[in-house]
């Protein structure tokens, strides 16, 4: 065992009797803390804390964070915590700064915890080594796990090594990563991946690959349904929609893989699944941009924004109720059964003329074609180009990105990473251009959809929204002016060569 601060685990309970009374010439002192307390294991749905090698626990009114280094830090948190950004300033908030502000914490396991501290004392009663033990018993599954955090006290390496060896002799193992805690304390533990890697075999056909991609993202969409219904955070609906959008891209871009009739049926089917989610997502985006909107306008116009966001919040509540009802409806259940029969049953989609093409051959052809289309549109854009063509460039870039990601495992990881990175830079500018455009249209519709009488509230809303539209328009123009420069950067000789090498046949 390593002679430094380290976390260990043991499958089962550990009592003070198992330690005995001494280690060599040093006395073992057992300090039992208060009676058992309730614990909660916290993480976001995307398990960003686990993926960082950490474990976040709530014991009574204290947050405890186990770091990959073996260090343990704590922070008082008297109230239940949803978002890390809402936590008061302190060591845990700082350590978890990587957690997305859009992701809410969830209780992924809970139960009771017994705590005790084991200290090694010399004949002068000085502590030479210490271990904090926490025994967790899950309330969901019949399992118990004990974590031991061995604290290295400077100047006493021998005592530390002795206590480390004692833990080893008792059956403790070094906790290399937090997965063991998740596996032991969570019923039906599984790892969520919003962008799962899809392995494509050397002999796989275009048809096999299309079906595999659709099956994969269907599972991602279905994994997010409960979070949409429970309204845990806005990312559940976002990931649900992105998954369906990727499926629709497969159906649209994989021409010839499915029969014309089947392709048309699939387009309608997935369009119908997507449609009911649109308005709620729009409202989520507006509410997430709330702070930005207030920053853009002087305080004299903030009252109108307050009124507007109250209306958005009320509409969002109505939209969420409607979508929840839809998710639980017989009609959606019927739609999903139809989809599952096609992609998980014995009656797969009808194949088209290109279905039997080798996946690699098909991939290079469709990616190269999409890349050339992106270049053709972008090279024709200047200051007089209509906005619709700039929007079309954004759509084609997104299609190109999806295609490259779908087939990424067929190509060198480093080369694909370089291509995607250069494409992202262009997409970011196009995305901002689109966001400002969409927001202007939405705000105009918001005003036009209401017959505003000359009340104080309606006048304030009209003034604020009018000013906001003007500012967003200016920002859109700025981003539009960057598009040509960003494309020139994307369309450099190195990127052209990379695309030709990877995809031109």
Language-model segments: residues:
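Function-determining surface determinants
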Residues: 1-505
């Amino acid at each position: 065992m390593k002679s430094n601060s380290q976390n260990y685990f043991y499958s089962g309970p550990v009592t003070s009797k198992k330690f005995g009374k001494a280690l060599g010439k040093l006395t073992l002192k057992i300090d039992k803390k208060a009676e058992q307390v309730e614990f909660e294991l916290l993480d976001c749905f995307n398990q960003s804390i686990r993926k960082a090698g950490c474990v976040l626990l709530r014991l009574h009114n204290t947050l405890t964070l186990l770091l990959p280094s073996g260090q343990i830090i704590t922070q008082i948190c008297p109230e239940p915590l949803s978002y890390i950004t809402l936590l008061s300033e302190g060591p845990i908030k700082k350590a978890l700064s990587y957690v997305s502000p859009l992701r809410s914490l969830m209780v992924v396991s809970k139960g009771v915890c017994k705590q005790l501290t084991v200290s090694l004392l010399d004949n002068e009663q000085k502590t030479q080594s210490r271990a904090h033990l926490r025994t967790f018993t899950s309330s969901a599954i019949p399992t118990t796990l004990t974590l031991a955090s061995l604290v290295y006290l400077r100047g006493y390496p021998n005592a530390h090594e002795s206590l480390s060896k004692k833990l080893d002799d008792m059956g403790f193992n070094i906790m290399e990563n937090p997965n063991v805690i998740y596996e032991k304390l969570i019923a039906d533990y599984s790892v969520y991946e919003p962008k799962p890697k899809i392995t494509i075999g050397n002999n796989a056909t275009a048809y096999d690959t299309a079906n595999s991609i659709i099956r994969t993202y269907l599972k991602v969409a279905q994994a997010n349904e409960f979070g949409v219904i429970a309204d845990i955070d806005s990312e559940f609906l976002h990931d649900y929609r992105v998954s369906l959008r990727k499926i629709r891209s497969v159906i649209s871009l994989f021409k010839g893989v499915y029969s014309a009739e089947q392709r048309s049926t699939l387009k309608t089917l997935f369009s119908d699944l997507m449609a009911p989610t649109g308005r709620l997502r729009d409202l989520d985006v507006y509410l997430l941009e709330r702070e930005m909107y207030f920053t853009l306008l002087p305080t004299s116009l903030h009252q109108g924004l307050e009124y507007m966001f109250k209306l958005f919040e009320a509409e969002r509540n109505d939209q969420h109720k409607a979508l929840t009802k839809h998710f639980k409806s017989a009609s959606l259940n019927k739609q999903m059964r139809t989809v599952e029969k096609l992609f998980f049953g014995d009656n797969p989609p009808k194949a088209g003329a290109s279905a039997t093409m080798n996946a690699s051959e098909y991939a290079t052809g469709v990616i190269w074609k999409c890349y050339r289309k992106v270049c053709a549109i972008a090279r024709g854009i200047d200051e007089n180009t209509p906005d619709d063509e700039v929007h079309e460039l954004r759509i084609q870039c997104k299609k190109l990105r999806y295609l490259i990601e779908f087939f990424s495992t067929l190509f060198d990881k480093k080369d694909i990473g370089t291509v995607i990175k250069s494409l992202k830079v262009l997409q970011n500018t196009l995305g901002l251009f689109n966001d400002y455009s969409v927001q202007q249209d939405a705000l105009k519709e918001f005003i036009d959809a209401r017959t505003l009488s000359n009340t104080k509230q309606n006048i304030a809303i009209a003034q604020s929204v009018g000013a906001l539209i003007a500012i967003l328009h200016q920002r859109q123009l700025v981003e539009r002016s960057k598009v040509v420069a960003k494309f020139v950067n994307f369309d450099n000789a190195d990127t052209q060569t990379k695309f030709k090498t990877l995809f031109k046949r």
